[in-house]
Amino acid sequence: VTSYTLNEVVPLKDVVPEWVRIGFSATTGAEFAAHEVLSWSFHSELGGTSGSQK
């Protein structure tokens, strides 16, 4: 069994619009294979001006 790991930090605000959907896709060509996402992490911070909200 061969195992591969992909780890990448991407500043999404620089490459995608404000509203976006993220998905995964994989292929091996003509052969059958199973692809599993074993771990997924997402962190988001709201930007904007400081001050009280009404």
Curated annotation (Swiss-Prot):
Give disulfide pairs as residue numbers: none
UniProt entry tagged with the keyword Manganese:
no
Gene Ontology molecular function: carbohydrate binding
**Subunit relationships:** Tetramer of two alpha and two beta chains.
Q: Which PROSITE patterns match?
A: LECTIN_LEGUME_ALPHA
**Acyltransferase as UniProt keyword:** no
Protein name per Swiss-Prot or TrEMBL: Lectin alpha chain
- Superkingdom is Eukaryota
Q: One Pfam family name from the record?
A: Lectin_legB
Which key words tag this protein in UniProt?
Lectin
The UniProt entry's sequence similarity note says:
Belongs to the leguminous lectin family.
Q: Which organism is it from?
A: Lathyrus odoratus (Sweet pea)
User: Record's InterPro entries?
Assistant: ConA-like_dom_sf (IPR013320), Lectin_LegA_CS (IPR000985), Legume_lectin_dom (IPR001220)
